Structure formats: C-alpha cells, structure tokens
C-alpha cells in the first residue's frame, strides 16, 4: 500500500507519519518511510539544489523538471520495488504537492504538470493521501483516495483517526490509479 501525507508546513505530517509507521509495524506490516523531494541518493542531491537559497532565481519550469526527476528516481528505485515486495510505503509529500506549489503557487499550467507528473511516475498514484489541516469544505472537493484529517486536535486524536482510516483501507487498496491530480 502506498500512503502519502500532504499539508502545509507545521501541520504535523512528520509526527503523524512516525506514529502511523510505529502502529503499522506493531500490526506486523513492513513499512518504508520516505519523503519528497528526496528518498534516494539522486533525489537527495536534487533536493539540495532545489532548497539551496542561492537558487532563488530558478525558473518555474526548471523547478518542476527537477522535482519530476527526483520523483521519477524515487518511484523507480524505492516505491515500486517496495510495493512489489508487499511493503507499506509512507511518503511525506508526493505529486499532489506539485499542483499546489508549482501549479497554484508558481502559475504553471495544471495540465502540463499532470502530464509531466504522469510521465515521471509512470502513472503511479497513492492508494491513500492523508491531507492535514484543511477545512471540511475544502476536503469535500477531494477524490475518494483523500482522507481529510482535522489536525487542530491533539497529536493522539489525529493519530487515532489516521489509524482508523488506514485500517479501513488495508485490503481494499487500489495501488495503481489513473493520475487525477
């Protein structure tokens, strides 16, 4: 099963990912934790370029191509092999961040972003995306693979809800969906 976490910085993604991984391991699952950009040696090198304050003049098209290169390596080297081995992969961010940051944030054409992302991932989408810290109204606009979690509660309450959602999806997962960002 491939699970991704999205949400603004400071929404508790890292904490919730760690707690979910601990719980899944206690349930007997093999879990791989990863992040984007990064997740592989090549991806981490690209992450360094993307996050270098010296590169503030980076063109938006250059940025999306670098993120996509990192993602392509991530999928090929880590995510697909882990899925094939029956592991649960939990990623701190994935392709949905591309629409938010490069699409809405940097003004790139959403259809172009979808096409580039589909090429980079070979169409691989998560079975479940957990999005922290959005309103219920925004959450209703998502697809059925999204689980909107109210992150304004205690860490324990948020984790309990995440566990409930993941438990319900285990065994019902759809690993390879058409790309609908």
Positions of predicted regions on the chain:
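Conserved lysine of the Walker
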Residues: 13
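Conserved phosphate-donor/acceptor-positioning beta-strand/loop module used by diverse small-molecule
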Residues: 91-93, 114, 122-139
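Walker A (P-loop) phosphate-binding loop of P-loop NTPases
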Residues: 10
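ATP-dependent small-molecule kinase phosphotransfer cores
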Residues: 29-121, 161
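Hydrophobic positions on the alpha1 helix immediately C-terminal to the Walker A/P-loop
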Residues: 16
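Hydrophobic anchor at the beta1->P-loop junction of P-loop NTPases
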Residues: 3-5
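Structural signal for short hydrophobic segments within the conserved structured cores
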Residues: 32, 65, 128, 147-149
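NTP-dependent small-molecule kinase module
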Residues: 19-21, 137-181
């Amino acid at each position: 099963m491939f699970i991704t976490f999205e949400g603004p910085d400071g929404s508790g993604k890292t904490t919730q990912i760690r707690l979910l991984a601990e719980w899944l391991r206690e349930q007997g699952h093999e879990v791989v934790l990863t992040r984007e950009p990064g997740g592989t040696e090549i991806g981490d090198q690209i992450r360094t370029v993307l996050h270098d304050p010296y590169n503030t003049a980076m063109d938006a098209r250059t940025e999306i191509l670098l993120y996509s290169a990192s993602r392509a390596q991530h999928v090929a080297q880590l995510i697909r092999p882990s899925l094939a081995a029956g592991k649960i992969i939990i990623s701190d961010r994935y392709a949905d961040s591309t629409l938010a940051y490069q699409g809405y944030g940097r003004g790139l054409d959403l259809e172009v972003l979808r096409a580039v992302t589909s090429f980079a991932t070979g169409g691989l989408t998560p079975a479940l995306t957990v999005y922290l810290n959005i309103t219920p109204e925004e959450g209703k606009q998502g697809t059925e693979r999204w689980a909107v979690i109210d992150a304004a509660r205690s860490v324990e309450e948020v984790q309990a809800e995440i566990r409930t959602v993941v438990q319900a999806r285990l065994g019902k997962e759809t690993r390879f969906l058409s790309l609908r960002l």
